[in-house]
Amino acid sequence: MRSFLFFLLILFALGATETFAQNGGKAEPLRIEFAKGKTSTVLTRSLSNDQQMQYIFGANKGQTVTIKNTKTSLFDFKVFSEESFPEGDFDSSPTYTFVIPETGDYYLFVRKKRVKAPRTASFSVTLTIK
């Protein structure tokens, strides 16, 4: 019976290790999809200090992107693309607008700032693409 339990333990450990390795130990970004006929969506989540949420969205060259952050004292954000924004910095602006330089996928990171209180808070970020 012990050897059977040991075998199950090893099998479970190998499966967990493989799953962890496939994802690189990191959660995949959430793909932002717009409802049909809509050009904006509101992203909401709760994060603790220094935690961040990663999203990905597609946009075409020439489209205008606007990001609205309602809680600039608690959250900041950055847009990242290896081709267009390789050195993106976190921004605490209430509104940030830019024109998409190249068609493709862009990452949007929302990060909870480190503050004494509240340690956990909910963000509401609006992403508009026109």
Model-derived regions, located:
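Sec/Tat signal peptide C-region and signal peptidase I cleavage site
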Residues: 16-21
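N-terminal secretory signal peptides
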Residues: 22-66
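C-terminal edge strands of extracellular/lumenal beta-sandwich accessory domains
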Residues: 22-33, 55, 112-130
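Bacterial N-terminal signal peptides
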Residues: 7-15
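Residue-level marker of intrinsically disordered, low-complexity segments enriched
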Residues: 8, 28-30, 40-41, 77, ...
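Acidic, Ser/Thr/Pro-rich low-complexity intrinsically disordered segments
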Residues: 47-113
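Bacterial N-terminal signal peptides that target proteins for export
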Residues: 1-7
